[in-house]
């Protein structure tokens, strides 16, 4: 993997790790789907100057626009929608464990849809990284797993499949159109699809933007600019430079980074599990890169 792709992925993973802390701050006064809507709107505004400078839709035909719209659904509305709905019916522990299947999903989908080879080293690397994430979670989280509401579990798994499809099809479109163009259109179209969803949630819960605290606005601004704009752009830059399987495994670096950020910002304890698990994740990523 080129050094540029590796740096892009590590930066994106770090920003997404911080996003969990920022999201917790935002959710104190803002409903979840409205948080998603606002962060995507802010991210879309970051891309608008480029869209105008590039000549708007003159540079892209309607067929491509339709493909980008479908891609935006996988990465925004469908992904966030099924994830949020699933969390209403299943436990957070179940959801966190299911997220470890993300890179495995990407590994399988990229083999079927893109023809990328699943080598022995790649497979072992992903499994080692999975083990690392499970160690970071710890026995308390794993032991709290329960076969509760199947509906919720299936919805969370569906959200993971959506992100896998987003990554695989995003890789294909990035190769054809370039990272900046794909990320810009996916973000803008995703924001457009989230507006009615966020508005419906706000109306149902009686939420008003005036209820949002200054700290929550700062968190949402960070989520929009750093996480939805910059991190997603870097993710697509990496997809344009490397195989989606090798890119996907970097998602396993997010849980250890999140734990470190939580320790620094929220005062949570850095445990032996975190250290050992992080070493396994790094080893797994290294194996997959060389696969």
Residue ranges of predicted features:
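Transmembrane alpha-helices of multi-pass small-molecule transport proteins
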Residues: 29-78, 105, 109, 162-169, ...
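Hydrophobic transmembrane alpha-helices of multi-pass small-molecule transport proteins
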Residues: 47, 69, 109, 118-140, ...
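Membrane-interface helix-cap regions at the ends of transmembrane helices
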Residues: 18, 22-25, 29, 43-61, ...
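Specific alpha-helical transmembrane segments that line the substrate/conduction pathway
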Residues: 34-45, 75, 80-126, 159, ...
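Helix-helix packing/entry segments at the starts of transmembrane helices
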Residues: 13, 36-38, 95-101, 168-192, ...
